[in-house]
């Protein structure tokens, strides 16, 4: 309350009344100061704040005028109470000044309030000065000094002014106190909000860090699973590559066998040398194909020249044949002369021999004439066959030219494919490098530490970056797979190119051999010409003429044999080329199938990864609700260990199967080695047969020995066994060995026929020797006549012939004995060969049985793996259904829980008792603890009579239990283990109930 105005003191007023009034005024002033004391220091603090904010300096209540600043006419010692009161007005501190200072530091709207507080303090200062003056006047009045009326008026005016100033200051103080209280309240509210925001922010940070850690763990697990799957795929690829390499090794073996068979090819290899050189140059120099074409054209031109030379040689041979025919006519003349001489000799010998001997000589002459006629017809047939062979040779040359053009086109196509593959490989490598750089940049960004106070927004950006990183990982894996496939294709192409280089080198070597043989043939032709000149000089001898005809016949036989060999070699080469093309096509198809399987597996891996991502997203959503489900997690770990044991058992079974496969392969290799040994034995026996045939050829008569020797030399290579390269089945091997045995038997029969012929020749020689010997005996009895000289010469000739016949007869008999011994040895060798073929057939049967067993095991393994994959897919489908049902059941439970909470919040509206399940929920909410909720129960607050329904009344719970029973008891799936896979956030207990921890 503001003190009332007092009238001015009168001059005659007593000192006691004045002192009492002053004391009352001081008391009221103190009360007023005590009431308004909280508001005054605020202004002082604000002024101090303005000084700290570089505002212009203003006087405060603490800087009020001291008693020395009062005018001299008012100077008087003031009482201590007034001085202390004035100091209290300007110096009293406030406890909330710091809060207001911290809260209003940057607000420009409080400047007007500060000016108001400044004016109130100024008015208080003036009031204190007036009080000091009044006190000084009172003291002066007490001391005996009189007051004038003017002073009294001034005092009254001052008093009125002070009253007005006090009223205004009171109003302003009230306003300031209200504003201060409002500011305090605002400051307190802002502090509370800041604390709440800090707590919320810390909680959000903790939740986000937990979720990010869980996501990182999940990503680490998925990466580990993907790495394991990648390792499995790599092992599968390694197995397929090993199988492909084995097939390539088999193809190399086949190629080596083909190369051994090609050594006997003659003119075919000469024409194929162009193709081989082109292939070799294409493999070595992929860019110099045009130069190689020119070289091949030159070689073709040379070959055409060589063909023309051969034609010229054939024409020369024809001319020589004509000369031989002329020589034959001359020989016939000589024979006629000899016949005349023989007739003369017969006339002379008629005296010493009987008519029977003369008749035998005539028969011999007739037989010689018939042989000459037969030889002439045979020569004409040889000429016709030579012409036919020339025509066939021209046809073969044309066919080889067409094949060479086809091979040139194929080589060009292969070079283009290699170039395109190199370009694709470089492009893929660039893409991989770019992806690696982008991955490194993303990893560096991910490894950078997050800011201390990240906002709530960047989580989405991080998720986007993670998605991009996963996509880049997928692209990188896909590109690496493509790059590996490209590398494998390049390796296969390089391997094929190397094989073709080896073949071309062998063909070149054979061409060189053929050129050397051509030179040798030229030399042989020259020697033949020289021999024929010598033969033309000795036309008188029938024996030499027979040898020439035999040589011609041998040449014809050689040509026919070479023709047959060339045709057979061509057919075999064509067949081999077809088989190689078919095998190449099969290998390419297998490679394509492997690529498709790899792509399918990669797609399946991507699908599984997407499913895992979906499952992980669901798990992250429910991870906060099921964190403390430790018992179920331990059970799941035990199940995981059991599954791991099952997987180990399966891997052991797979290792056993692989070991058995390796054993089967070793057995197959042993059988193959035994086959090779048998083939070597067959070759040795064939060589022995050749040696025997050569020895037999030495036993032929001197007149016909060369002919038979050359025939046997031509028959030996025909009887040599050519082991085929495609003996895969048992039937083929048995047929091959039966054919070999039949061929050996044929050779044995042929040798027996030769023995019979030798016997017949020996008999004929004995018959020829008998009349000559009788003639000699008769000559010894008959006396010599006038023609002693002629008879002596004829007797000497006959004696020499007899000696030769006797020596030849003895040699033939010895050779006959040796031939019998050799025939017995050959029969023994044939018996051994038949026994060895039987053992080889048994080995082949064992190999086929082992191969069938391995195939059956492999099929069983594939069926088991397919069954496991099918069970895995079915288990995935069931788990997805189970997850959907659990989510549906959880949603229903949440709905019923919400309904129950609504009912529990309004207990007055519900008359029925609350079921036990709802009481448990209320207790859980009050205690803020975790509680186990059975999914088999379905809490449902009923309207009317409340009760807990049975588990079988809820269809979702029934479906969940049915799926869990199917998963735990897979009776229809023998391939799966006894412990099924169940996600870790739920599991059935002994009562077939799923318990979930609810927060």
Swiss-Prot record:
<feature type="modified residue" description="Phosphoserine">
    <location>
        <position position="66"/>
    </location>
</feature>
<feature type="compositionally biased region" description="Pro residues">
    <location>
        <begin position="1"/>
        <end position="11"/>
    </location>
</feature>
<comment type="similarity">
    <text>Belongs to the GOLGA2 family.</text>
</comment>
<comment type="subunit">
    <text>Homodimer, may assemble into homohexamers. Homotetramer; forms a parallel homotetramer with a flexible rod-like structure that can give rise to I- and Y-shaped conformations. Interacts with GORASP1/GRASP65. The homooligomer forms a complex with GORASP1 with a 1:1 stoichiometry. Interacts with RAB1B that has been activated by GTP-binding. Interacts with p115/USO1; interaction with p115/USO1 inhibits interaction with STX5 and/or RAB1B. Interacts with STX5. Interacts with ZFPL1. Interacts with AKAP450/AKAP9; leading to recruit AKAP450/AKAP9 to the cis-Golgi.</text>
</comment>
<feature type="region of interest" description="Disordered">
    <location>
        <begin position="244"/>
        <end position="288"/>
    </location>
</feature>
<dbReference type="InterPro" id="IPR043976">
    <property type="entry name" value="GOLGA_cons_dom"/>
</dbReference>
<keyword id="KW-0493">Microtubule</keyword>
<feature type="modified residue" description="Phosphoserine">
    <location>
        <position position="438"/>
    </location>
</feature>
<dbReference type="GO" id="GO:0005801">
    <property type="term" value="C:cis-Golgi network"/>
</dbReference>
<dbReference type="GO" id="GO:0050772">
    <property type="term" value="P:positive regulation of axonogenesis"/>
</dbReference>
<dbReference type="GO" id="GO:0051289">
    <property type="term" value="P:protein homotetramerization"/>
</dbReference>
<dbReference type="InterPro" id="IPR043937">
    <property type="entry name" value="GM130_C"/>
</dbReference>
<dbReference type="GO" id="GO:0048471">
    <property type="term" value="C:perinuclear region of cytoplasm"/>
</dbReference>
<dbReference type="GO" id="GO:0033116">
    <property type="term" value="C:endoplasmic reticulum-Golgi intermediate compartment membrane"/>
</dbReference>
<feature type="modified residue" description="Phosphoserine">
    <location>
        <position position="934"/>
    </location>
</feature>
<dbReference type="InterPro" id="IPR024858">
    <property type="entry name" value="Golgin_A"/>
</dbReference>
<dbReference type="GO" id="GO:0005794">
    <property type="term" value="C:Golgi apparatus"/>
</dbReference>
<dbReference type="GO" id="GO:0000139">
    <property type="term" value="C:Golgi membrane"/>
</dbReference>
<dbReference type="GO" id="GO:0008017">
    <property type="term" value="F:microtubule binding"/>
</dbReference>
<feature type="region of interest" description="Disordered">
    <location>
        <begin position="444"/>
        <end position="468"/>
    </location>
</feature>
<keyword id="KW-0472">Membrane</keyword>
<dbReference type="GO" id="GO:0000922">
    <property type="term" value="C:spindle pole"/>
</dbReference>
<dbReference type="Pfam" id="PF15070">
    <property type="entry name" value="GOLGA2L5"/>
</dbReference>
<dbReference type="GO" id="GO:0007020">
    <property type="term" value="P:microtubule nucleation"/>
</dbReference>
<feature type="modified residue" description="Phosphoserine">
    <location>
        <position position="273"/>
    </location>
</feature>
<dbReference type="GO" id="GO:0005874">
    <property type="term" value="C:microtubule"/>
</dbReference>
<dbReference type="GO" id="GO:0008356">
    <property type="term" value="P:asymmetric cell division"/>
</dbReference>
<keyword id="KW-0132">Cell division</keyword>
<feature type="compositionally biased region" description="Pro residues">
    <location>
        <begin position="448"/>
        <end position="457"/>
    </location>
</feature>
<feature type="modified residue" description="Dimethylated arginine">
    <location>
        <position position="30"/>
    </location>
</feature>
<feature type="region of interest" description="Interaction with GORASP1/GRASP65">
    <location>
        <begin position="989"/>
        <end position="999"/>
    </location>
</feature>
<feature type="region of interest" description="Interaction with p115/USO1">
    <location>
        <begin position="1"/>
        <end position="86"/>
    </location>
</feature>
<dbReference type="GO" id="GO:0015031">
    <property type="term" value="P:protein transport"/>
</dbReference>
<dbReference type="GO" id="GO:0007409">
    <property type="term" value="P:axonogenesis"/>
</dbReference>
<dbReference type="GO" id="GO:0090307">
    <property type="term" value="P:mitotic spindle assembly"/>
</dbReference>
<dbReference type="GO" id="GO:0006888">
    <property type="term" value="P:endoplasmic reticulum to Golgi vesicle-mediated transport"/>
</dbReference>
<dbReference type="GO" id="GO:0032580">
    <property type="term" value="C:Golgi cisterna membrane"/>
</dbReference>
<keyword id="KW-0813">Transport</keyword>
<keyword id="KW-0175">Coiled coil</keyword>
<dbReference type="GO" id="GO:0006486">
    <property type="term" value="P:protein glycosylation"/>
</dbReference>
<feature type="region of interest" description="Disordered">
    <location>
        <begin position="1"/>
        <end position="80"/>
    </location>
</feature>
<keyword id="KW-0653">Protein transport</keyword>
